[in-house]
UniProtKB/Swiss-Prot annotation:
Organism name: Bacillus cereus (strain ZK / E33L)
Residues that bind NADP(+): 39, 45
UniProt: FMN binding residues: 132-134, 253-254, 298, 313-317, 339
Pathway: Metabolic intermediate biosynthesis; chorismate biosynthesis; chorismate from D-erythrose 4-phosphate and phosphoenolpyruvate: step 7/7
Cofactor binding notes: Reduced FMN (FMNH(2)).
Name of the protein this chain belongs to: Chorismate synthase 2
GO cellular component terms, semicolon-separated: cytosol
Keywords, in A-Z order: Amino-acid biosynthesis, Aromatic amino acid biosynthesis, FAD, Flavoprotein, FMN, Lyase, NADP
Catalytic activity, as annotated: 5-O-(1-carboxyvinyl)-3-phosphoshikimate = chorismate + phosphate
Protein EC: 4.2.3.5
Family membership noted in the UniProt record: Belongs to the chorismate synthase family.
Length: 390
């Protein structure tokens, strides 16, 4: 499976085309809209989320609530486009139009794609860069993730995400929660945190950053249960599932780090405390005593829960802008200010769920049959029986 997205932040719409989704998957706009709504929530979101409704329109690949096996096209309209019709229109603008009408930007913002993108593509108007590099694009990545989650659900895999840290405020580790319990708790938390004792402290940190014109980042974790043993491959570097998951996390706007299982903590522990001992019994088959590997060894699943974390840096659009240089005059200026969030970590957690879900669903479809859901389900059932008796 693969997908491609298109659209600008203040353009008429965002589009995603999904290829390789099996036939026979139950899919409705309601499934996708539920995930889009989750992305819009979270303490610290900016005014843009008060403008956009973010509802999907399925325009191909689905008939009467069932996927056809052909490419699926999803679009999400940008409600804010009505205020940007002239600025973001596709037709040429006359020479008489002023810079103000075009809303031309010549001052790149530190921490963004602005300067590097302008140099790469030769744009003298940095708006041409920021409109596409904006995290607004993750709207349709969440839509794609919603389709992947539906695949996982029908294949017996559950997934959930939560926030571990915001602005230096750390949540306590809470173990032995089911995926359903994690989902319930986080959906009722304004910061998607499992630890209620630090919830208010996280919100205070966000509010303090906002009042001072600053921004803060954090850490999110995604957990998936129900993956069969042996999904992925050790044979080639580009087939290793952990590599794909790390790449997916790092592809999210403003994410600067990824780890699986105990991650970087493994560097501080001896091997005897890191590696997960193998157990077997007639009821479960092969299991592990611990899950320090985060459900992945040698680029393949172990049958234990997949545990992936991502680090999001503070959003670089600040209301007390950093120093920059005008690309036209080369004079020092304060960077341009675009409407932004003070903290998007809770929403980014939803995006992280989506990209992890896509990679897991892709791996299952690739390994167990690409054409139709019924065949994939049969093959996974047969594989699980084989793995248990191996």
């Amino acid at each position: 499976m693969r997908y491609i997205t298109a659209g600008e932040s203040h353009g008429p719409q965002l589009t995603v085309i999904l290829e390789g989704v099996p036939a026979g998957l139950t899919l409705t706009a309601e499934h996708i809209n539920k995930e889009l709504l989750r992305r819009q929530k979270g303490h610290g979101r900016g005014r843009r989320m008060q403008i956009e409704t973010d509802t999907v329109e399925i325009v191909s690949g689905v008939r009467h609530g069932m996927t056809l096996g052909s490419p699926i096209t999803l679009i999400v309209k940008n409600d804010d486009f009505k205020h940007w019709t002239k600025v973001m229109g596709a037709e040429p603008i006359s020479e008489k139009e002023s810079k103000e009408m075009k809303r031309t930007i010549t001052k790149p913002r530190p921490g963004h794609a602005d300067l590097n993108g302008a140099i790469k593509y030769g744009h003298r108007d940095i708006r041409n860069v920021l409109e596409r590099s904006s995290a607004r694009e993750t709207t349709v990545r969440v839509a794609a993730g919603a389709v992947a989650k539906q695949i996982l659900k029908e294949l017996g895999v559950e997934i959930a995400g939560h926030v571990l840290e915001i602005g230096g405020v750390e949540a306590k580790h809470i173990s032995n929660l089911s995926i359903e319990e994690i989902q319930t708790i986080t959906e009722n938390s304004p910061v998607r945190c499992l630890d209620k004792t630090v919830e208010q402290e996280m919100m205070d940190a966000i509010d303090n950053a906002k009042s001072s014109g600053d921004s803060i980042g954090g850490i999110v974790e995604v957990i998936a249960e129900g993956m069969p043993i042996g999904v992925g491959s050790y044979v080639h570097y580009d087939r290793k599932l952990d590599a794909k998951l790390a790449g997916a996390i790092m592809s999210i706007n403003a994410f600067k780090g990824a780890e699986i299982g105990v991650g970087f903590e493994a560097a501080r522990q001896p091997g005897s405390k890191v590696h997960d001992e193998i157990l077997w019994d007639e009821e479960q088959g092969y299991t592990r005593k611990t899950n320090n590997a985060g459900g992945l060894e040698g680029g393949m699943t172990t049958g234990m829960p997949i545990v992936v974390r991502g680090v999001m840096k503070p959003i670089p659009t600040l209301y007390k802008p950093l120093a920059s240089v005008d690309i036209d005059t080369k004079e020092a200026f304060q960077a341009s200010i675009e409407r932004s969030d003070s903290c998007a970590v809770p929403a980014a957690g939803v995006v992280a769920e989506s990209v992890v879900a896509w990679e897991l669903a892709h791996a299952l479809v690739e390994q167990f049959g690409k054409d139709r859901m019924e065949l994939i389900q049969q093959n996974i059932t047969q594989h699980n029986k084989y793995a248990k008796e191996f």
